[in-house]
Amino acid sequence: MKTLILTLLSLYELQLCCGAYNQNIRSQRKFEMIKTEISSYKDVAKSIIDLAVHGKAQNRSYERLALFVDTVGNRMSGSENLKTAIAYMYKSLQEDDLDRVYLEPVKVPHWERGEESAMLLEPRKKSLAILGLGGSIGTPVEGISAEVIVVSSFAELHNRSKEAKGKIVVYNEPFVNYGETVRYRGSGAVEAAKVGAVASLIRSVTPLSVYSPHTGWQWYENDVPKIPTASITVEDAEMLSRMASRGLKIVIQLKMGAVNHPDADSYNTVAEIVGSKYPEQVVIVSGHLDSWDVGQGAMDDGGGAFISWEALSLIKDLGLRPKRTLRLVLWTGEEQGGVGASQYYELHKKNISNIDLVMESDIGTFMPLGMQFTGKPEARAIMTEVMQLLQPINITSLYDYAEGTDINSWMQAGVPGASLFDDISKYFWFHHSQGDTMTVQDPVWMNLCAAVWTVVSYVVADMEEMLPR
């Protein structure tokens, strides 16, 4: 009996092994078929690349963007400029003869900075360049004049908490990388308020400064007093730190006319090329249309928005129609935490099984180096093959972890996601500053970015099967 049981167990294990082996063989065969399918797009990919980089569409995304930002300017959430920008894009997309163009209403924060200034009163008089941080409250009309404490970290602030009461906290945090250093912009006011400070000034989150403050959104916490907060230049933060190290008394007068208005009406702007075979299934290409209220918002995120529009234009110009719908979404309210995209997700998540791939470009359109991808290993293997279609421009690398505030909800829910990976070595020089203008952009780089964006989105949208998830 014991021998029989062992024999049956052995046969069962053998069956399992054979089943796994056969499954692996089937998977390998299927993947080889997918590779063959992807390889069949070489001519189409070359046509897209030729049109975008060398043909009639050369420099088009750059020229469209230049006209847009020169005409509209920056596009702060809730502002009249953003309304103008959305109307401009709605009209332009209609004129591009795409299949569907429509607006989806959302609510967005409406904050205005108003007049603002900072004056060093002691140990000498000097005007300090500032940019109020998004969501900040204002000061009284007469401003706030207070002694300053300079710290280089949250840990130092907490260790010196008794010194901070009634003072303005100046953070002179070193730039490590954006993800690490931006914590001071986001939470600096809250941490300062917890120890009794009356305002906070944050060293701009940038590795390079030419006396230019960089703004950005910050967040208050319930049950913590709200205090005014602004960014200052790297140069002034370092000067104040040197003064403090010499034991000098530092006094600053801060005036901010910032106002938080009720949420405003806005729209996500959407355009589509409807799929020929599976129109209910969708590949999304996207960038955000809003920007900060300084500079032109050409880099952040005009470039990403306009290469996403260019993807649909190139496909239309070549007379192509993918099997799935290719959907352009120009998000609103991204700079306030992706509020437009969050509302889009809530509205459309019931159709999540039909969202094949979400793509977002929001970290510049400099020289493209490849794509970042988040998804199952099987999907990654397919995307690796798709990237090989870009060999004519030598941009074939696929990196881990797609990035994008506006597509995070989809990726967290299991939808494959992709983002443009480009040379961002200079990105944070201009980020959220007056320097974010059309001068940052390069038409050759934008052509290449558009080619990458279009080839990937079209091929994924046209393949017979959706990406595994």
UniProtKB/Swiss-Prot annotation:
InterPro entries: CPQ, Peptidase_M28. The active site is at E334. It holds the Pfam family Peptidase_M28. Its main location: endoplasmic reticulum. Zn(2+) 2 binds at D300, E335, H432. Keywords: Carboxypeptidase, Endoplasmic reticulum, Glycoprotein, Golgi apparatus, Hydrolase, Lysosome, Metal-binding, Metalloprotease, Protease, Secreted, Signal, Zinc, Zymogen. Residues 20-42 form a propeptide. It is found in: Endoplasmic reticulum; Golgi apparatus; Lysosome; Secreted. Residues 1-19 form the signal peptide. GO terms for biological process: peptide catabolic process; proteolysis. Glycans are attached at N59, N159, N351, N394. GO terms for molecular function: carboxypeptidase activity; metal ion binding; metallodipeptidase activity; protein homodimerization activity. It is an enzyme of class 3 (hydrolase). Gene3D superfamilies: 3.50.30.30, Zn peptidases. Carboxypeptidase that may play an important role in the hydrolysis of circulating peptides. Catalyzes more efficiently the hydrolysis of dipeptides with unsubstituted terminals into amino acids. PANTHER family: CARBOXYPEPTIDASE Q (PTHR12053:SF3), PROTEASE FAMILY M28 PLASMA GLUTAMATE CARBOXYPEPTIDASE-RELATED (PTHR12053). This is Carboxypeptidase Q. The gene is cpq.
